[in-house]
Design a protein with these regions (language model features):
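Short catalytic/ligand-gating loop segments at beta-alpha or beta-beta junctions
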Residues: 3-14, 101-123, 175-179
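Active-site-adjacent mobile loop/cap segments within catalytic or ligand-binding domains
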Residues: 48-76, 104-171
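Acidic, glycine-rich loop-and-strand cores that form catalytic or ligand-binding grooves
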Residues: 78-107
């Protein structure tokens, strides 16, 4: 099953492994993933939204981390595009989040970096992919914002802007951010 690689024996691994598998199943047979069987839906990107664990001794902001992976499948996606597109997607989304959060909420919001790491969710999808670790759910300084609905809206809008910029760059199109 695309939802349970372990056939129900390990809910933890099924949770994170199913995401890349079902992205490939949805996109299989389409122009973005022509060699795999699937539903022939041209999925342009995959995105995993997480918070992560971690605390600081002085309760400072932990901030936002972006994760992608390039060193799989000969550094190419199924359609032949460079896996470095995941870096570009990650950079656009993370840059929009950090800029908007610093502007509207917290000038000291931390941009933790972009990790090119072999996380299953970043490695397996055959389309550009980003894992976002928005903030630390164990850290009070982060969660002061993480519990604020206005912050949720700002972050969601920043993600939308980054995805819009990424997609328009892929299709060589101008973009207009939907006004509020």
């Amino acid at each position: 099953s695309v939802y349970s690689e372990s056939n129900g024996k390990n809910d933890y691994t099924d949770d994170y492994k199913c995401r890349g598998i079902w992205v490939n199943y949805l996109s299989g047979g389409s122009a973005v993933n022509p060699t795999e069987k699937g539903l022939n839906i041209p999925v342009n990107m995959a995105f995993a939204f997480h918070s992560d664990a971690g605390t600081t001794l002085n309760d400072s902001i932990i901030g936002t981390l972006g994760i992608y992976y390039t060193n799989a499948y000969n550094e190419k996606f199924a359609n032949g595009a460079s896996r470095y597109l995941s870096h570009d997607l990650t950079d656009l989304i993370q840059s929009n989040i950090v800029r908007d959060v610093r502007t509207l909420y917290e000038p000291q919001w931390t941009r933790r970096g972009k990790w090119n790491q072999s996380y299953y969710e970043a490695r397996v999808p055959r389309v550009p992919t980003m894992l976002l670790e928005l903030l630390s759910h164990q850290n009070f300084a982060d969660m002061r914002y993480g519990l604020d609905p206005r912050f949720h809206f700002t972050v969601s809008r920043a993600i939308y802007k980054g995805m819009l910029q990424f997609l328009c760059s892929q299709y060589n199109m101008d973009y207009v951010v939907q006004p509020l």
